[in-house]
Amino acid sequence: MRILKPYLRSTSIQCYLCLLLNSHFLTEAGIHVFILGCISAGLPKTEANWQSVIHDLKTIEHLIQSMHMDATLYTESDAHPNCKVTALQCFLLELRVILHESKNAAIYEIIENLTMLADRNLSSIENKTELGCKECEELEKKSIKEFLKSFVHIVQMFINTS
């Protein structure tokens, strides 16, 4: 039998051992701790969300190619790893330009999903100020194709540091 989520098995075993070894966990509060521990072990990890962001970006690229959009967007092409959160926030703002220019329902759904996934991932990163990073308006304007390529690169920076 193949275990699809091996990290669940080890967490469950740890919870069982804790219950067995500590008799005071046999109270109602102990049972609540056990249940919440099991639930939290089953929550998805953020790495999967970043992969979904990349998938959504590639889908947007295919949709835009069929529409022949020629907008230019502020693009961070060589972001320093210390500025990746600032760069990602700029990319998310520029996605709104694509949304406005395309007026396409499919792109609207994808951008809303992508924004939600990215915001959820950003909220899990500690809120710190990144000094020396360029503001969005200071970035060079590039084609949508270059914008999406750079966006994927920034997301991969988040995956590599997770």
From Swiss-Prot:
Give the GO biological process terms: immune response; interleukin-15-mediated signaling pathway; neutrophil activation; positive regulation of cytokine production; positive regulation of immune response; positive regulation of peptidyl-tyrosine phosphorylation; positive regulation of phagocytosis; positive regulation of T cell proliferation
Q: According to the record, which residues are glycosylated?
A: 113, 121, 127
Which cysteine pairs are covalently linked by disulfides here?
Answer: 83-133, 90-136
List keywords of the entry alphabetically.
Answer: Cytokine, Disulfide bond, Glycoprotein, Secreted, Signal
Locate the coiled-coil region(s) and give their ranges.
Answer: none
- Pfam families registered for this protein in UniProt: IL15
Q: What residues make up the propeptide removed on maturation? A: 30-48
Q: Where in the cell is it found?
A: Secreted
- Principal place where this protein is found? secreted
Q: Read off the Gene3D superfamilies from this record.
A: Interleukin-15/Interleukin-21
Q: Name one GO cellular component term.
A: extracellular space
Signal peptide as annotated in the record: 1-29
- Respond yes or no to whether keyword Secreted is given for this record: yes
Q: Name one GO molecular function term.
A: cytokine receptor binding
Disulfide bond found in the keyword field: yes
- Briefly state the protein's biological role: Cytokine that plays a major role in the development of inflammatory and protective immune responses to microbial invaders and parasites by modulating immune cells of both the innate and adaptive immune systems. Stimulates the proliferation of natural killer cells, T-cells and B-cells and promotes the secretion of several cytokines. In monocytes, induces the production of IL8 and monocyte chemotactic protein 1/CCL2, two chemokines that attract neutrophils and monocytes respectively to sites of infection.
Q: What is this protein called?
A: Interleukin-15
UniProt organism field? Ovis aries
